[in-house]
Regions:
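Tandem CBS (Cystathionine beta-synthase) repeat/Bateman regulatory domains
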Residues: 1-170
Length: 170
């Protein structure tokens, strides 16, 4: 369980956790694979979300998934780029979260194994990404400002020691 005082400080930064959908490169599931290849090459991301026509996250795609299709024969072929759709290649088994309903602790646990998590609303519509990087930035904020917000007293400190410490700090 995350300490309530730490959770409070993290929640102060939680608005900056979410990178909004308007700033995220994505492809649609019915796009030609060629389109995904171009997007991934241009934006230099390793993985991007795949959305359906209703802007729900239905998958993830990487450049490696596309190049695997190009290498299925004995030589490199660009034919699959024109013949296949993104939905034919995308990863369908992935984690996504509803930012409002997912606890900070659950977010942190999911980010251990995922560099980012697609964030959806209650209807499954893509809202943006929660990234490990943004979470680490929030944690950095907590580590560097905790003492500005809270007086931390070791549990093994006696009452006279505590009183002396408080008096000395004034």
């Amino acid at each position: 369980m995350i300490s309530p005082s730490i959770q409070h400080l993290i929640e102060e930064k939680s608005g900056s956790f979410l990178i909004p959908a308007s700033r995220i490169a994505f492809v649609q599931d019915d796009n030609p694979l060629y389109h995904a290849f171009l997007i991934l090459t241009k934006v230099k991301y390793s993985k991007i979300p795949v959305l359906d026509k209703e802007h729900r996250v239905v998958g993830l795609i990487t450049l490696a998934m596309i190049t695997d299709k190009m290498l299925e024969t004995d030589e490199i072929s660009t034919d699959p780029l024109n013949e296949l759709k993104v939905k034919d290649v995308m990863q369908r088994d992935f984690q996504k979260i509803n930012f409002v309903e997912t606890t900070l602790e659950k977010q942190l646990h999911l980010l251990i194994d995922n560099p980012f998590l697609p964030v959806v609303d209650s209807k499954g519509v893509f809202q943006g990404l929660l990234t490990r990087r943004e979470w680490i930035k929030a944690f950095n904020y907590v580590v560097h400002t905790y003492d500005d917000h809270y007086n931390v007293i070791p549990k093994n400190q006696t009452k006279p020691q505590l009183i002396n410490k408080i008096v000395a700090s004034k």
